[in-house]
Amino acid sequence: MGEHPERVLRRVVPDPVQVQVILGSLLGDGRLEGGEGERRLHIAHHQGRAEYVWWKYERLGIFAAHTPVLRGETLEFHTIAHPVFDDLAPLFSGPDRKRVRELLAPLGLAVWMTDVGRLRLRAEVFLPTQRAAALVAR
């Protein structure tokens, strides 16, 4: 009998776009849940930002535990537990927090600013090569 699919997915390495969506989300409204070995990412935004939640889901879909669901006025989803979240957890607490800036690329910054309401991600503002990498679902 084969391995459970979730265990197999824990060995999949996030691509650069996924890493930036994760970093930007964690700097914004996203949060890590669970302890070491079981950490997962929780994404939640007001239902009025449903298009944005689905955009994040499309980029992180392989790691999503379920499709976005509406709870009250919040549309949310969780990822599966993944080792990348254990690796990132120290960067989002304590003295290592400043190291996040070294990892952040323009897409991660855009996600962060969109999360906090300072920016709206729009495909037409990206250069064609950036659009292909950042905005087109894979």
What do the predicted segments below correspond to?
Residues 1-138:
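Internal intein/HINT superfamily modules and their associated LAGLIDADG
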